[in-house]
Amino acid sequence: MSQPAVTASSARQFRAGLNGAVVVFALLFVAAVMPVLWPNLPPAMVDYSNHLARMFVLARDGTAQAHPYYQVTWSLVPNLAMDLIVPGIGRHIGVEMANRLFYLLSQILIVTGAMALERAVKGRLQIAGFVALIFLYSTPFAFGFENFEFGLGCALWGFACAVWLQDRSWLARFAAHTAFVALLFTAHMFALGIYGFAVGLHELWRAWSQRASLRETFARFSALVIPSLLLAAFMVAANGSVGGSGNVWVFGDKATWILHILSGYNMVVSEIGVLALIWLITALARRNALRLEQSAMWLLAGFSALYLAMPFRLFDTAFVDMRVVVALALIMPAFVSVSFPDAIWRRIAIALAAAITVINVSGVMIVWLSYREDFAAARKSFELLPKGAIVMTAQTGDGGDPPTDLRDYPVFNVPTLAVHHADAFLPHLFTAPGKQPVTPRAPWRRLEFPERGFLPVRFLKYVAEHGAPAGTPPFVQNWVRDFDYLYLIGPSIPNPMPDRLEFVLGAPRFALYRIRK
């Protein structure tokens, strides 16, 4: 007669634990997006400022205030999510606010997309939301890869829809795949690749596990492949492109990058967080608390192989292999069911997820707060630039990109905001053909150098004193003659060329000089 009481007590404990997890998740979500919601906190992410500068150019296009050095040339290229969304909204609420809200929307898509996928696979929500919060400021996202983050969030939703519709009619699956292929191509090409790869692996598992006939397998894959083939044919007919042609493999760093994926600002924090997650996964696995669902092993094996094979730079897009790791980290929780041995282990898991999230977000807040003086000084420096100045950027360090201390990385692209505030020309504004719809006007194209890193100032000094050696990029061969001002980014150093540079303004992480003619 005591069993019903025990069962009722267990049910109450389960509901209490579930309600507690929901409350903790809600609080963690608010904490995780707090840096973006804080209006006076500068978003100190390396690519964010460069993207923001391009949004200003797009918002001004077609008006009397169109930029004197840059033009907008629309074509059939991917990676246009923010380019299509932010400028139009920015004309009504301000470009800076619109860009911040776009980044917030991308974060929401990442978290909700991971949760939607888990619900589609397991029929319930369990761990995916917590894992998504842990990775919300992982390396690709903390670097300000905005279109990729938005696209990956959409890809997670697309994968969830594919699982939801896997037993529906061919026409329903074809329509859904077509819609997501079009959406993801527009958002970010690599996010489209992640979506296609994940859905393809899931379909392979389904065909294998159900011993489907060749005819049925062909029919199912045709619903996935036909939209991609139509897109490819349309791109060929329209002379579209997907970026540059530079591919670079860095196999020696792949093991360490897994340890450094969790935080885009602090490698030690990332290492501790990754090792803590590995410990938790190992401890739960030893207690038979983890169960793989559906295509979990296929996804794990496929994405692991993809990570090993993927170059660091693909079509002139960097950190590509690290993006594979983040995608896998967001997908896998949906395919792993956890049966905690007891309430203590549930509390340990939630506490560990909360601790990693809070520590990671706190690190983000500390770095962003430390940049308030630099961003304020940058705005002041833009006021000191004459309208239409030709401005160059170089490093005080050794030319490393990224630098050894990732906390110094966000300053790299801050000077590009002079494109808007001073109508300036800068070689490093993102204007890569096949990736962005903004290009320099014809007279200035010889000076562009987008997405190719920042040269050390000692190299500029060598060119000024001895001439340009073979292989020197065109924009720097006659830099003293071609440019009016120079931003030196990185740790403060004495004036490296007093005879050629006149100090204008300094900040903790950069200095502005006028180039003497």
PLM region descriptions:
Residues Y371, F382-P469, F475, W479-P491:
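Short periplasmic/luminal acceptor-recognition loop of GT-C membrane glycosyltransferases, typified by
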Residues A334, V338-V364:
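Signature aromatic-anchored transmembrane alpha helix within multi-pass, membrane-resident enzymes
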Residues L101-V121:
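Transmembrane-helix motifs of polytopic, lipid-linked glycan transferases
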Residues F143-F150:
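Short acidic/glycine- and proline-prone juxtamembrane loop motifs at membrane-interface regions
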Residues A53-R60, Q71-V95:
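Short hydrophobic/aromatic helix or loop-helix immediately within or flanking a transmembrane segment
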Residues F315-D342:
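Hydrophobic/aromatic-rich transmembrane helices and adjacent perimembrane loops
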Residues A114-L136:
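Transmembrane-helix signature of polytopic, membrane-embedded enzymes
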Residues P42-N50, G62-A64, Y70, P78-N79, ...:
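Transmembrane catalytic cores of multi-pass membrane glycosyltransferases
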